[in-house]
Design a protein with these regions (language model features):
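Conserved N-terminal subdomain of the carbohydrate kinase-like
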Residues: 2-89
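Electropositive phosphate-/nucleotide-binding environments in soluble metabolic enzymes
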Residues: 3, 22-26, 42-45, 67-70, ...
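Glycine/small-residue-rich loop that forms an oxyanion/phosphate-binding "nest" at active or ligand-binding sites
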Residues: 69-118
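Conserved phosphate/ATP/ADP-binding segment of small-molecule kinases
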Residues: 100-182
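Short pre-catalytic strand/loop immediately N-terminal to key active-site residues, enriched for Gly-Thr
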Residues: 185-196
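Conserved post-catalytic alpha-helical subdomain immediately downstream of the catalytic base
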Residues: 196, 206-248
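Charged C-terminal helix
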Residues: 230-273
Length: 273
C-alpha cells in the first residue's frame, strides 16, 4: 500500500504550491524535488490565484506569518477548494502569539483542509482555540507516549470529526487519524529535531503525497509520515564521526531521493488503531 503511494508521486510529479515560511523554504523545495514532485513558492496576492490554479496541491505554513501573506493564504485556499486540489495546513507555533492563533482559526473556518499537520502542542492549541506553545517546538508536557497513546488517538479522531480534516501529529510517536481510523507510526530518529525545518519539510512532502493519491488521503498521509521517518533512520546511519546536523539534513534529502517503494514497505513501522 505504501509502495503505491510513493510510486504515484514519482509517476505523476505533482506541482505543489507552497505559501510557507522563509526560514525553511529551500529545504521544502529540495524535499519536494527529491521525492519526485515539483515545487513553486509564490505568496503575492496578485498571483496566488493563478499559481494555485496550475498546481495540484497547496501547502499553507504560518511559520513566518505576516499581514501580507495572510490574505494570500485565504485566496489561495479558496481557489484550491474550488478546484478540488489537495490542501494542507501547518500551524507552526500557533500558540506563540495572538496573531498566529487568530489566523489559524480563521484559516480552518474559511478553507477546507484535507490535512492539518503539527506537533501535539500545536494541534492541542488549535483544537482549543487558545493556549501557548514553546516557540515552534512541542512542550515536553504534551509528549505522546505509550502511556497516553490511547487518549491521544481518541483526541485525534474527535478533532478530525470536528474539523473535517485528517489530523496528522508528528513527534517521537506519530498519529495520523480521520474520524474513524487512526494509524500510529514509530519511524524516525531523535536527531530530526536538531535540524530546522523537519516539520516544514514533512508538510510539503505530505502535500505531494496527497496530490498524487487523491483516492486515499489517509493512507497517503501515513505513507508520507513513514517515508520521512524511514529517511531519518537511513540518514542517521550514514553519519560519520565528524558529521553534524547539517550533514544529517543533506543525508535526509538524499534518502528521500533514493528511496524505493520496496524499501519503504520493508522499513515502515506503523499500526492501525
Amino acid at each position: 500500500m505504501l509502495k503505491e503511494c510513493l510510486e504515484n508521486v514519482r509517476k505523476n510529479s505533482p506541482l505543489i504550491h507552497n505559501i510557507t515560511n522563509y526560514v525553511t523554504v529551500n529545504d521544502c523545495t529540495n524535499i519536494l524535488l527529491a521525492c519526485g514532485a515539483s515545487p513553486i513558492m509564490a505568496d503575492d496576492i496578485n498571483e496566488v490565484e493563478e499559481i494555485t490554479s496550475i498546481c495540484n496541491g497547496l501547502n499553507i505554513n504560518i511559520g513566518t506569518l505576516n499581514s501580507r501573506t495572510i490574505n494570500s493564504m485565504h485566496k489561495a485556499g479558496w481557489t484550491a477548494n474550488r478546484l478540488s486540489h489537495a490542501v494542507l495546513l501547518d500551524p507552526v507555533g500557533v500558540g506563540a502569539s495572538e496573531l498566529r492563533i487568530r489566523t489559524a482559526v480563521e484559516l480552518v473556518k474559511n478553507i477546507k483542509f484535507d490535512v492539518i499537520r503539527g506537533n501535539i502542542s500545536e494541534i492541542k492549541t488549535l483544537a482549543n482555540g487558545s493556549g501557548s506553545t514553546r516557540g515552534v517546538d512541542a512542550d515536553i508536557r504534551d509528549s505522546i507516549t505509550e502511556e497516553n497513546l490511547t487518549e491521544y488517538v481518541k483526541f485525534a479522531k474527535q478533532l478530525s470529526k470536528n474539523m473535517d480534516a485528517i489530523i496528522a501529529i508528528s513527534g517521537v510517536i506519530d498519529i495520523v487519524a480521520d474520524s474513524k481510523d487512526a494509524y500510529v507510526i514509530y519511524n524516525g530518529h531523535k536527531i530530526m529535531s536538531k535540524i530546522t525545518g523537519s516539520g516544514c519539510m514533512l508538510s510539503a512532502f505530505t502535500t505531494a503525497y496527497l496530490a498524487a493519491n487523491k483516492d486515499n488521503k489517509l493512507l497517503a498521509t501515513v505513507a508520507a509520515f513513514c517515508a520521512m521517518g524511514v529517511a531519518g533512520e537511513i540518514a542517521q546511519k550514514r553519519m560519520g564521526e565528524l558529521d553534524g546536523n547539517a550533514s544529517f539534513r543533506n543525508y535526509l534529502i538524499d534518502a528521500i531521493y533514493n528511496m524505493t517503494g520496496e524499501q519503504l514497505e520493508a522499513m515502515a513501522k506503523y499500526e492501525k488503531r
